[in-house]
Amino acid sequence: IIVPDSAHGTNPASAAVCGLEIVQVKSNAMGLVDVEDLKPLLDDTIAGIMMTNPNTLGLFEKDIKEIAALVHACGGLLYYDGANMNPLMGMVRPGDMGFDVLHLNLHKTFSTPHGGGGPGAGPVGVAQHLVPYLPVPKVLEDVDGSLYVEGSGADDTCGRISGFMGNFAVLLRAYTYILTLGKQNIRMVGPLAVLGANYIKESLKDSFKLPIASVCKHEFVFDGLLDQSTGVTTLDVAKRLLDYGFHAPTIYFPLLFHQAIMIEPTETESKETLDGFIEIMKHIAEEALNDPESLKTAPHTTPVRRLDETTAARQPVLRYRDLA
């Protein structure tokens, strides 16, 4: 499986769990899949490529049709990680870009909590030519609009799988969200998210390092502070944000940049909230120059200060008392 170097780690991990070898394709200077680097990787041993579009840098892969043609020509499939469907809802169909299989991240695009206190749910969709391989049973619609259950399926079906419906409550929330917005309003989600992201990006590019200056979609990535002479890191900026009442954004991801700060405002934030965030980020950038220690020792107002996050991740304590 070919995976871009900008991809989320779950992409190569998922393929590896299935026993596939991971081959990485590089990004070009614009942060997009380098088509020339991709071409030598394509042969009859390739099962396919996993991509997100827009990609993890928030950039639309403009060469996606060419990439699809190249991968299909050697017998491979295109798998779409639906993490970034937010700016495309109601405007672009992944199948029209050439994708054969996709999953939708309901917590990223369709307003559901991240699992809702239980397992997550990621609906999987396939192009028509892969329908015979879907698991059974299947709920189908007859010509008269009635529904029926097909228990056996085609000879190529992968058969029955346990928990095939995932977390039903999460699916129901996503379905409710879609019905509530309706066809017209769901098309407004993307433009609002894109507008908010670009507004923040352009407002902060004189304070934070912007490695790729092109128009982004719903998210973008800074590479730390523009002036890094004081030694203030992305982690320091994230911790200081907590003192001002803002949840810290994703940091140190994607791995293409050493001091990555990923900012994704979504479509729901008001201009007042965006302006408040911009003001605080500019203030933090000034603090980094004039009082760097205030960032290096942040946060100052939270119940706990800096945790040993490495130990917490590797040796988690999941109970408040020892039950042994």
What are these language model-derived features?
Residues V92, D142-F164, L171, I178-A324:
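Non-catalytic terminal extensions of PLP-dependent enzymes
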